[in-house]
Curated annotation (Swiss-Prot):
Assigned keywords, A-Z: Cytoplasm, Queuosine biosynthesis, S-adenosyl-L-methionine, Transferase
Organism per entry: Shouchella clausii (strain KSM-K16)
Subunit structure: Monomer.
GO CC terms, sorted: cytoplasm
EC number, as in UniProt: 2.4.99.17
SUPFAM superfamilies: QueA-like (SSF111337)
Name the UniProt record assigns to this protein: S-adenosylmethionine:tRNA ribosyltransferase-isomerase
Functional description taken from the UniProt entry: Transfers and isomerizes the ribose moiety from AdoMet to the 7-aminomethyl group of 7-deazaguanine (preQ1-tRNA) to give epoxyqueuosine (oQ-tRNA).
Protein family (similarity comment): Belongs to the QueA family.
Annotated localization: Cytoplasm
InterPro entries the UniProt entry points to: QueA (IPR003699), QueA_dom1 (IPR042118), QueA_dom2 (IPR042119), QueA_sf (IPR036100)
Principal location class: cytoplasm
MF terms in GO: S-adenosylmethionine:tRNA ribosyltransferase-isomerase activity
């Protein structure tokens, strides 16, 4: 399958650079999975599309302030580290700027020595493994010394870092936000629960690979990045109960969808599980775990566009995106939302 089949022209001014003042003021494009009918709504109208007994699945990961600015201990040259993935102990996979200045044994200091890191390995694709040394709690130092990494297409400074977190963010470990969840307020979640919809929290720590363009010309040749996920016994029980009683499983975001599909693919049922997933969903894939999907509008030729296409069909997806562009919906992380209704 040619990657170019998932390309489309997006006016640059439709790429949202800042979040709306009120989370729930986003627009919502509703697409019926069966009929492909499209309707323009506002985000709080999501409640009307949900039924008692449905299960709304949210990713409670929390974005790390993963960008660190430090200096080489030996030369005082400025070095930027971007934490990608925690390995064993205090070792992290990172991206470094400028990479050419960092070799095995290079020591970098942050915050006048509050945090130091030594390069222990150079990866084939250019990344670096660093082992961190510190006193105290690592994530507290990260909160103090780090800054929030924003997607490369966002050029404006984020005034309030909390706006790149969901209101229910809890499990720290992501390099990027699960952006479909940014539209929810605490009040809206209470109203959804009051309707009889079950809310389930699962965890998938989002890696920066989510922004990596597909470099292969054929979809099937793309190598998907791996991300850590966890689903608890309580979450699995609620999901299984909803399915057994005829409720729809609605994934909030592609991260929730990938987590649930991983578990169903591996176990054939909703069970408690944790591990690393590199599941790649594109047209031809048969969804087993989810019935509906709430998601943002994604980049052309991205794996996320492919994932959504697998749920409603490529033609229906492209029709919906053409409508969204015509109606001036806001795209990408701080943009509007799309609900694929079961």
């Amino acid at each position: 399958m040619d990657v170019n089949e998932f390309d489309f022209d997006l006016p640059e001014e439709l790429i949202a650079q800042t979040p709306l003042k009120t989370r729930t003021n986003s627009r919502l494009l509703v697409v019926d999975k069966k009929t492909k009918a499209i309707s323009d709504r506002m985000f709080p109208d999501l409640i009307e599309a949900l039924s008692p007994g449905d299960c709304l699945v949210l990713n409670d990961t929390k974005v790390m302030p993963a960008r660190l600015l430090g200096e080489k201990v030996e030369t005082k040259a400025v070095i930027e580290l971007l934490l990608l993935k925690q390995l064993e102990g205090d070792c992290w996979e990172t991206l470094v700027k400028p990479a050419k200045r960092v070799k095995i044994g290079t020591e970098v200091s942050f915050g006048d020595g509050k945090l130091t890191a030594i390069c222990t390995a150079v990866q084939p694709q250019g990344g670096r493994i660093f082992e961190f040394r510190y006193s105290g709690v690592f994530y507290e130092l990260l909160e103090e010394l780090g800054t929030m990494p924003l997607p490369p297409y966002i050029k404006e400074r984020l005034e309030d870092a909390d706006r790149y977190q969901t209101v229910y963010a809890k499990q720290i470990g992501s390099a990027a936000a699960p952006t479909a969840g940014l539209h929810f307020s605490e009040q809206l979640l209470l109203e959804i629960e009051a309707k009889g919809v079950k809310i389930v929290y699962i965890t998938l720590h989002v890696g920066l690979g989510t922004f990596r363009p597909v470099s292969a010309s054929s979809v099937e040749d793309h190598q998907m990045h791996a991300e850590y996920y966890q689903v608890t016994e309580e979450a699995a029980h609620t999901l299984a109960s909803a399915r057994e009683n005829g409720g729809n499983i609605i994934a909030v975001g592609t991260t929730s969808a990938r987590t649930l599909e991983t578990i169903y693919s591996d176990h054939g049922a909703f069970v408690a599980a944790s591990g690393w997933t590199s599941i790649f969903i594109y047209p031809g894939y048969k969804y087993q775990a989810i019935d509906g999907l709430l998601t943002n509008f994604h980049l052309p030729k991205s794996t996320l566009v492919m994932l959504v296409s697998a749920l409603i069909g490529k033609e229906a997806l492209m029709d919906a995106y053409a409508h969204a562009i015509k109606e001036r919906y806001r795209f990408f992380s701080f943009g509007d939302a799309m609900f694929i209704r079961p």
